[in-house]
């Protein structure tokens, strides 16, 4: 497949060698001072061929979607009724996935988002890190992410065969679906794909910050049993 352009940049990976730090305290200086393994990479621009990529094969998918409400939200607009116990019992027996929806609120001026082809990023290149929620004073900042003391995260280690992609000049009517987890484990279906923002050298000096929204969705495939 031929892409119209590519970006030469560096991505920060988790170090593959040395002592393994298995826990981070979120929102603290220590989390930002952790060791990194910075590697030069090529990121391909899929603009014009974005329809080639799908969630179940590559782990990500670009879509067009015009939203009536982009820049503002109110609590009443996002509240949903709780499901019944019967519905919950049914869903627990079906295939399920976690899919993030990322979209810009304005045209992206800098620091675009890149995703890796799930087939090129092997399980051995992923490291599970526990993100611990900071003290009680700051915990409220993480209430939307967890009601507990923290949560697990996967960080990537570098491997030469990894392939990265992005779509240039994304607009608010364009969104990126990113698969974070899929219970279907058949050896063919993409189960997760790493993603990261990156510095495009051509827009490094742009002062306007990127404004974007990321929504995490719990998806149930009611026509497919839990494998």
Curated annotation (Swiss-Prot):
Pathway(s) where this gene product acts: Secondary metabolite biosynthesis
EC code: 1.-.-.-
Presence of keyword ATP-binding: no
Disruption phenotype: Abolishes the production of hydroxyaspergillic acid and leads to a reduction of ferriaspergillin analog containing hydroxyaspergillic acid.
Domain of life: Eukaryota
Triggers of expression: Expressed during the earliest stages of maize kernel infection.
Alphabetized GO MF terms: oxidoreductase activity
Protein name: Hydroxylase/desaturase asaB
Organism: Aspergillus flavus (strain ATCC 200026 / FGSC A1120 / IAM 13836 / NRRL 3357 / JCM 12722 / SRRC 167)
Gene from which the chain derives: asaB
């Amino acid at each position: 497949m031929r892409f119209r352009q590519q970006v030469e940049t560096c991505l920060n990976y988790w170090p593959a060698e040395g002592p393994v730090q298995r826990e981070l305290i979120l929102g603290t200086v220590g989390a930002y001072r952790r060791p990194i393994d910075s590697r030069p990479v090529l990121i391909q621009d899929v603009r014009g061929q974005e329809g080639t990529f799908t969630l179940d094969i590559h782990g990500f998918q670009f879509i067009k979607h015009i939203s009536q409400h982009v820049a503002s939200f109110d609590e009443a607009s996002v509240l949903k009724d709780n499901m019944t116990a019967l519905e919950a019992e049914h869903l627990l027996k079906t295939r399920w996935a976690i899919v993030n929806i990322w979209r810009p609120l304005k045209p992206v001026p800098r620091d675009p988002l890149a995703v890796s082809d799930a087939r090129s990023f092997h399980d051995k290149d992923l490291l599970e890190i526990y993100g611990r929620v900071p003290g009680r004073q700051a915990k409220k900042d993480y209430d939307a992410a967890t009601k507990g003391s923290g949560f697990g995260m996967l960080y990537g280690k570098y491997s030469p065969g990894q392939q990265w992609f992005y779509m240039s000049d994304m607009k608010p009517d364009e969104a990126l679906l990113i698969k974070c987890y899929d219970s279907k484990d058949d050896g063919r279906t993409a189960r997760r794909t790493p993603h990261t923002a990156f510095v495009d050298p051509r827009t490094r000096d742009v002062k306007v910050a990127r404004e974007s929204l990321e929504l995490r969705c719990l998806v149930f495939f009611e026509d497919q049993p839990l494998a």
